[in-house]
Amino acid sequence: MLRRANRGNVAQKSVAQDRRNNMEVVHHGGKASVTGSCHEMRADGQALLIDCGLFQGADERPLAVEFSLGHVDALILTHAHIDHIGRLPWLLAAGFKQPIYCTAATAELVPLMLEDGLKLQLGMSPKQSERVLTEVRRLLRVQDYQKWFAVQPKRADSLWVRFQPAGHILGSAYVEIRRPNGEVVVFSGDLGPSHTPLLPDPQSPERADYLFIETTYGDKQHEDVQSRGQRLRAMIERSLTDGGAILIPAFSVGRTQELLFDIEQLIFSQQIDANLPIILDSPMAQRVTRSYRRFKQLWGREAKARLQMHRHPLAFEQCITVEDHRTHERLVNRLASTGEAAIVVAASGMCQGGRIVDYLKALLPDKRTDLILAGFQAEGTLGRSIQSGQSSVWIEGTEVEVNAHIHTMSGYSAHADKADLLRFITGIPEKPKQVHLIHGETSAKQAFAAELTQLGYSVL
């Protein structure tokens, strides 16, 4: 059972100035941090929650939902990453019974992601976990992209909501909320970068009177996404000269599929040895990848073109999947003892859990090992500690030497960079009355705020 904690999380209030209709947004997470997204919009006698995510890394705090829920009409989910849905079990434990709206792909991914979290983080039995998941499934309400729906159809002054493709992961969306007075409030969720081959680029909203936008990379420019496959090839070639394994920690949703997509292209174009073992050691990632294949209609133009060539970019024959834990243990021991070459893609992306941890414990001390960090490593995570160049790290109570070669590679971020964010905002035909910066570290938000202020935007 989930119990309510004695102390709650501090909510940060951000008031969008509309005195006549008394609209406000209260942040229950994800305002001053990258994780734990949970925003409550109160307007026109109604209230919506947008996401209810898990706090991770340095943001970790008690997860019990202490804020009032009796007045909340619905929960809107932008996508299925755990830092946007991970507090759902605590929300239910606090008595939430209202509809949970999301896209079809997100509705398929949410139970998968939560099941993994309930098992790993709470140690729930399958029976306990299924009880929670059954209730989540009961509340889920699937909505199509680009179609308005009323939160309270029986009210003449209902808030209306619309999902637009966000390009972040499969099923991801930014949320448009239309008020009775015609104003539109937009919550970006997590926006994807431009020019990724697997998902289409996000398009700017037609209107956003109040914009709440993520700033994960508000102060950074990614390397060119279109050339990332060649950078990956060069990194693999360099790593193979060391001998040993190439480890790539990757989130089960999004980055794993992007990596497989590029590796398939390198094999197809004969730029890496077709006999090099490509190991996907993440049961969750395997299930998610099957979901990606089922929702091919959401893929981008380049990905669909490969399908028309009868290629299988997420299920190519060289990709070996590891199902059971015994096989996983044998593989870790084999790579540690033989030093043979292989590419291992395993969760989790920030090295905070999952099967990648076993590989790190066994192979970080080996100078033949190469570790490619292909995404954001939040402060306080094992991934950030390794990335910062520490000579040793603590893993599950054991001090582990870091002799492996550590590489950081951009281009695989599922987040928009500074240029993408600016393009999204400046693409809105009329400037928002207010732009609220959320989901970012302080330095990123400050730098991005300065850019927007110079362009004449009102930034909070």
Task: Please provide the spans of the model-predicted regions.
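Gly-rich Lys/Arg/Thr-decorated short loops/hinges at beta-loop-alpha junctions or inter-strand turns
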Residues: 208-220, 398-408, 429
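Hard-cation-handling environments
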Residues: 235-374, 379
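C-terminal structured "cap/appendage" subdomains that terminate the fold
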Residues: 422-452
